[in-house]
Amino acid sequence: MRTGEGTAAGSVEWGAHLPLIGLGASPSLPALRAYVRTAAALGFRYLCANDHLVFGRPWLDGPTTLAALIGESGDMTLATTSSLPVVRGPVHLAKALAAIDLLSGGRLIAGVGPGSSPADYAVAGIDFEQRWPRFDEAVRALRALLHGDPDGVEGAFYCTRGVVLEPRPARRPGPPVWVASWGSPAGLRRVARHGDGWLASAYNTTPERFRECLDRLAVALRDAGRPAAPFPHAIATAWLHVTEERAGVERMLAEVLAPMLNRPVEALRSLPLPIGPAEVCAERLSAFAAAGARRIFVWPLGDELAQLERFRERVVPLVSEHHGQ
């Protein structure tokens, strides 16, 4: 049994990550507006913002940037992929997400995760080893706050009993909460307990593993007393660079991704990321679609506008052709 959403086999909706780390030391709001307008015009359905407090490179704040670009986003669904309720605190994060949902007319997916960076926890003064129990409680508190539930949560780490944040989100009872997980058994059980959807990570999985995770998630949902279908999911943070030049591929892996992710180049070469010629990118993304992926969110590296256009013009048609979309 597998989670499903009633869509045609291989049908994929595309999302674009905001280039929060691609703007160097001088971020430009006009450049970001142009990026979002381009993504909307090219037919991307989702606009995504990741989240870190500190990072190895300059990082624009995700929720703030997403809010600043609502006016350019048309009818795109906005998604945090994912925000950090433990690091930010569930009340502070709920307040920000409620504002984004309200101002966008109810277009937000509240993607949340515990985060994998000890540095984020250190600057927030929170023990990294406590992230799992804190996350379980923080997600329940966040949902109660977004839903306007005055009973809230009273636990070991957070107390939101009697707290009602206003104004409320536009979507009722609240924006859907998708839980991020790399696909461990414990992580998928957490998705099944707390999530309205699952966010997978493109640089922490393969098509084969993703297919297995969908099957395990279906079991976890059943064990949690929830239906396996429909249960939405997406593969986020698919680093993208379409180039015909082998040197361009190596440059992206060695000079951009390896130091940014603190991973060996050899490990990155083994991942099925859409980096390389259009045919290679399409083949790798098609494999995820064949494994059951229904939404894939790409993060263009390099010249972001050119990469968005190149992806839409050269890669997407090949994926569609492969699956008869």
Feature locations, PLM:
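Active-site-adjacent structural elements that line small-molecule/cofactor binding pockets in enzymes
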Residues: 1-325
